[in-house]
Amino acid sequence: MSLGGPQIPVIVLKEGTDDSQGRGQLLSNINACVAVQDTIRTTLGPLGADKLMVDDRGEVVISNDGATIMKLLDIVHPAAKTLVDIARAQDAEVGDGTTSVVVFAGELLREARTFVEDGVSSHLIIRGYRKAAQLAVNKIKEIAIHLDLSDEGKLRDLLTKCASTAMNSKLIRSNSTFFTKMVVDAVLTLDQEDLNENMIGIKKVPGGAMEDSLLVKGVAFKKTFSYAGFEQQPKFFKNPKILCLDVELELKAEKDNAEVRVDKVQEYQNIVDAEWRIIFSKLEAIVATGAKVVLSKLPIGDLATQYFADRDIFCAGRVAADDLNRVVQAVGGSIQSTCSNIEEKHLGTCDTFEERQIGGDRFNLFEGCPKAKTCTLILRGGADQFIAEVERSLHDAIMIVKHALKNNLVVAGGGACEMELSKYLRDYSLTISGKQQNFIAAFARSLEVIPRQLCDNAGFDSTNILNKLRMQHAKGEMWAGVDMDSEGVANNFEKFVWEPSTVKSNAILSATEAATLILSVDETIKNEPSQQPQAPQGALPPGAANRIMRGRGRGMPR
């Protein structure tokens, strides 16, 4: 029963909170994601453009890698940040297809925008998109070609074709033959049961040509800081015992938190003698193990360096933790945090150890490692930005080759797979009734953005080529795709434009989840940034400082 009085408004959110809801907010979220798609879509494909980005520190990055671009874009719109997440997830999961997943997600939202403007419930669109995505993934499993990797003679050739497809869209496409061989060799070096890509190290050495890059079948890392006496140490061993430590072998003055009170000069001398005895006992214990190569995360000082040099032992301190961990995994043994009770099982070994000059740097190389199969790619190039882009390109190619080995299933690239899925979903949509027919047809149209964008980026007539592709797929040519060489249409499977099927499946599922997530949001609540307390202006009045501090920490005595 109403008493007729004015209703008092209930304030739930803090004053200053930005609260936007309704169809207008949903369209705003869609438009933000479409704007991000428009930024990155020009980088798609072998003839896509590169982006030059300058961060807040003035560092320059040149790349056409989707995950790198999305990471460096300073996106502030909360909905558009979802596209950054799916690009990172695609890069972490399969390594390639990061640009495609963002472009496809943006196109799904572009198609959905028309339905939202017409007042269609977003939940109906979500249901249609999810059904279409599942149908597309099932179709990929149906049409994917199984590679016969049992023949070692054909194995390398098949993997090379997969790697070259990933390379052709990168900055190093002119040298793709050289780097493709390096990538395939690197992946085949790994344990084929595990295929752990973390066992492939990548080191960058500025200077020289790209063809000066090399593959080391073992562990390699840059020479660490060394002290006097290092020059006398041997730089080459065969079958050495290797000891890895997390121990500091250095005499240094303790400046902080140190106080010694002595009554006699002899007492001070006893302290100094004890320090020398401690470090010499550590060095003697290391020599007694029979190790010829000693590595440590912590510094190895000049005294220890000269001590080891006199006994024909190589040492390196301040070794990076990731490099030392790779050495331990490759040569065996374990990292010791003490120099006492070191046994034979704690030591590793390899066929050869060598310190070699590469460009302007010296590298420590461990080759012929028995415990774990590992390798290191040493990249050369003129500019730091170029070498960094080469590293990103090789990472993508390594992941592609890894998934081709693991799953043995490939599909044709160049938009062929997307066009076949689009035809399949378009035909399927005609067999059902109701609004779901429109949503599945919209999903089918969205898939065509990949071949269309490939044509646009290459300067081709996208309308003409897409019409030809539709005709070819209607005739049953399911591997017909964009031919970048002849500006036309070709059977991309016969042209060896191959991609692992997992790249396509993961991209479709990730893009669909991102699009449906955006469509499910009907309200955005943005809290006002908290204000930092302002310091009082001018000098404090007498006694004010004591009053401010009163009550902090322990209570003041009464």
Curated annotation (Swiss-Prot):
Compositionally biased spans, kind Low complexity: 531-545
Q: Give residue spans, biased composition: Basic residues.
A: 549-558
| Subcellular location field | Cytoplasm
Could you name the Gene Ontology cellular component terms for this entry?
A: chaperonin-containing T-complex; cytoskeleton; cytosol; nucleus
Coiled-coil portions: none
Q: Which Pfam families match?
A: Cpn60_TCP1 (PF00118)
Annotated GO biological processes are: protein folding
Q: Where are the transmembrane segments?
A: none
Q: Which domain of life is it from?
A: Eukaryota
List the GO molecular function terms: ATP binding; ATP hydrolysis activity; ATP-dependent protein folding chaperone; unfolded protein binding
Which residue intervals make up region (Disordered)? 527-558
Instruction: For this UniProt record, give its keywords in alphabetical order, as a comma-separated list.
Output: ATP-binding, Chaperone, Cytoplasm, Nucleotide-binding, Phosphoprotein
Where does the record place the modification Phosphoserine?
A: S176
Principal localisation = cytoplasm
What does this protein do, in the record's words?
Molecular chaperone; assists the folding of proteins upon ATP hydrolysis. Known to play a role, in vitro, in the folding of actin and tubulin.
Summary of subunit composition and partner proteins = Heterooligomeric complex of about 850 to 900 kDa that forms two stacked rings, 12 to 16 nm in diameter.
Q: Which PANTHER family match?
A: CHAPERONIN
> What family does this belong to?
Belongs to the TCP-1 chaperonin family.
> What's the name of the protein?
Probable T-complex protein 1 subunit eta
Organism per entry? Schizosaccharomyces pombe (strain 972 / ATCC 24843) (Fission yeast)
